[in-house]
Regions:
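A short acidic, glycine-rich active-site loop
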Residues: 63-80, 220-236
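Residue-level recognition of beta-strand->loop/alpha-helix junctions
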Residues: 42, 103-105, 202, 259, ...
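A structural micro-motif
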Residues: 36, 97, 155, 196, ...
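Gly/Ser-rich helix-loop-strand patches that form or flank binding pockets
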Residues: 4-5, 25, 31-32, 112-165, ...
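Structural beta-alpha unit
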Residues: 1-5, 72, 76, 83-126, ...
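Short, structured motif recognition centered on aromatic/hydrophobic residues
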Residues: 11, 38-40, 89, 123-126, ...
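Small/aliphatic-rich secondary-structure junction motif
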Residues: 2-68, 165-224, 243-256
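Fold-core signature of tandem repeat domains
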Residues: 81-82, 114, 183, 237-238
């Protein structure tokens, strides 16, 4: 039975306030779950490249001694970070046996090292602070977070931000086959959680904003018919989605379907629904219906990720 399988999340931490929000989110939602494990990883930065090269101004013995001292210091800092993070999770309800730690030395860049560990460890998701790891922070969003969601990895990425933590989950999906991966992921992670409230949300856009004035007279006449067929297709899709979620032993009143028609801005409608409904977590796919593989992050997903603050966003490949 799916509910008996263990869920294992890789939490990337650098000891920053953003990283602590990730720990708070994980502990609030999953500490009481006996089928949930966490591995905390911290990436120790490498020795500066100029010290890796022969330097005529620096004696070789002294150079290597300095390299070893810096490596040891960086690794110890990474170890201290994961130890403190584990102490936080344990103090907030996680049994020590379900919290593991790893301190790793940076080999490529931080995002690639995290994804490599995620693939090798076969984790169910990677959780990271929305604004990224402090050492790699960027002006718009932490570059580590951005690289993680832009990667072609199949590992879902959880971007954690803000203080809104509750058991309300908004699954923003269109009718593409890849969207079933979003439902599968959420259903697997939350299976058996009697407190979870799940809303399957689909937005059907209006044709009118894209019509020229002289075309609206003709195409506007069929818009109602097209939207009706789209709505019927959406309801059939969500009936199938509900069957998938039903395998997680959710009760009928835990899962609802919400369809919005006539939208002029799909991303804005998803953001508004998340805020108005006070959802603590929004789950969506990297690419939407008709998305090209070359476009790793779809337009709607990008707008939601950048526009929705103070929530957790699960980005599923």
């Amino acid at each position: 039975m799916v509910e008996k399988l263990s869920r294992h999340i890789l939490v990337a931490s650098d000891g920053s306030p953003n990283a602590k929000r990730v720990l708070a989110y994980i502990s609030e939602l999953f500490a009481r779950r006996s089928d949930f494990e966490v591995t905390i990883v911290s990436i120790a930065p490498p020795v500066p490249s100029h010290l890796r090269q022969v330097n005529p101004a620096l004696h070789e013995v002294k150079r290597w001694k300095l390299v070893e001292e810096i490596e040891a210091k960086h690794f110890q800092l990474a170890q201290d970070i994961v130890i403190r993070a584990k102490e936080f999770l344990v103090s907030h309800g996680f049994p020590p046996s379900r919290v593991h730690t790893k301190a790793l030395v940076q080999r490529a860049d931080v995002a690639r090292d995290i994804l490599f560990e995620a693939r090798m460890g076969k984790y169910d998701a990677v959780a990271v602070g929305r604004r990224g790891l402090s050492r790699m922070a960027a002006s718009f969003m932490g570059s580590v977070s951005y690289k993680l969601i832009q990667s072609q990895s199949e590992v879902p990425v959880w971007l954690i931000d803000g203080q809104v933590v509750n058991s309300r989950y908004l699954l923003a999906v269109d009718l593409c086959e890849d969207c079933l991966k979003v439902i599968d992921h959420v259903g697997f992670i939350l299976a058996g959680d009697s407190e979870a409230e799940i809303v399957l949300y689909h937005v059907i856009p209006s044709f009118r904003p894209f019509m020229a004035k002289e075309e609206e007279f003709f195409l506007g006449e069929i818009e109602e018919l097209v939207l009706k067929k789209e709505e019927e297709r959406a309801r059939a899709f969500f009936q199938e989605a509900s069957k998938i979620l039903a395998e997680g032993n959710f009760s009928e009143n835990q899962i609802r379907v919400k369809i919005k028609t006539g939208s002029t801005n799909v991303a804005a409608d998803i953001i508004n629904e998340a805020q108005r409904g006070n959802y603590g977590t929004v789950a969506l796919g990297r690419r939407g219906q008709g998305g090209f593989k070359e476009m790793i992050l779809g337009s709607t997903s990008t707008k939601v990720i950048f526009g929705l603050m103070d929530r957790a966003i699960w980005v599923v490949a």
